[in-house]
């Protein structure tokens, strides 16, 4: 009976809550109406499609990417689609000063922030890893460190709005695959960092959600070009993928899986890890968790 009370019952409650809240909430487009949203990597691919979906829902958007020409076209289309407002600031996420200042400027343009969608990556080629340490450093800085910088800069505004962060990751951040070692390392790092921050926000009663979006192969132009002749797999549509990211983030889900296989969230969702994380909190001195 003691085992049931101390271990099995909490596990049952945890999983019932997890599956109930992850399957029974309904998304409504009006959830995004008037919301102030940042989308990075927004000049093409999934980022561009998210900007278009958000605009149709009546959100304010500030977009960023390296291509000013691409951003101009996307912003123009966003306004046509019904965005409450649409702006862009071009720059590279290799520059951490730009990454931080962009958040500040975007917040001023919109008068606050409700949702931060971190979607950008640096381009890499599929190849076996040998000794290119410079490539590893560059990928980690853009794909991981800039995410940390931007979310840190955005957190004060998100605390005021009880907002949300979407972190765009990949199956490569949940499982190992050949020829993408630096990219995979950056995506595993996102999971480790932002899942920890999610727990800390929960413990300190800060009402900011973090949604880790785990994506399979998506039919973006860049991805299709990179895998040509190397990987033979069917890609999922970027338009639907973008919408699922927005839905999951608006519903404040911890994780969103978007892949061709319905088994992916079951196989990679890692319930054992969630159980371990749940019980590990019992050993902490709760007085140490004081929100600033």
Swiss-Prot record:
Sugar attachment sites: 162, 207
Keyword terms of this UniProt record: Endoplasmic reticulum, Glycoprotein, Lipid metabolism, Membrane, NADP, Oxidoreductase, Signal-anchor, Steroid metabolism, Transmembrane, Transmembrane helix
Tissue: Widely expressed. Highest levels (mRNA) in liver, kidney and lung, lower levels in the cerebellum, cortex, hippocampus, ovary, testis and thymus, no expression in colon.
Gene Ontology molecular function: any one: NADP binding
Cytoplasmic side of membrane: 1-7
GO cellular component, one term: endoplasmic reticulum membrane
Residues involved in NADP(+) binding: 41-67, 92-93, 119-121, 183-187, 218-222
PROSITE patterns membership: ADH_SHORT
Superkingdom: Eukaryota
Pfam families tied to this protein: adh_short
SUPFAM superfamilies: NAD(P)-binding Rossmann-fold domains
Listed GO biological process terms: lung development; steroid metabolic process
Membrane disposition: Single-pass type II membrane protein
UniProt catalytic activity: an 11beta-hydroxysteroid + NADP(+) = an 11-oxosteroid + NADPH + H(+); corticosterone + NADP(+) = 11-dehydrocorticosterone + NADPH + H(+); a 7beta-hydroxysteroid + NADP(+) = a 7-oxosteroid + NADPH + H(+); 7-oxocholesterol + NADPH + H(+) = 7beta-hydroxycholesterol + NADP(+)
Pathway in which this enzyme or protein is active: Steroid metabolism
Residues reported in the UniProt entry to bind substrate: 170
Disruption phenotype: In null mice, 11-keto corticosteroids cannot be reduced to active 11-hydroxy forms. Plasma corticosterone levels actually are elevated at the diurnal nadir. Males display adrenocortical hyperplasia. During starvation, induction of hepatic glucose-6-phosphatase (G6Pase) mRNA and enzyme activity is lost and the induction of phosphoenolpyruvate carboxykinase (PEPCK) is attenuated. Liver glycogen levels significantly increase in the fed state. The liver shows a phenotype of partial glucocorticoid deficiency, despite somewhat increased basal plasma corticosterone levels.
Predominant place of localization: endoplasmic reticulum
Active site: 183 (proton acceptor)
EC number: 1.1.1.146, 1.1.1.201
Cell compartments where the protein resides: Endoplasmic reticulum membrane
TM region(s), chain numbering: 8-24
Subunit structure: Homodimer.
Family: Belongs to the short-chain dehydrogenases/reductases (SDR) family.
Name of the protein: 11-beta-hydroxysteroid dehydrogenase 1
Source species: Mus musculus (Mouse)
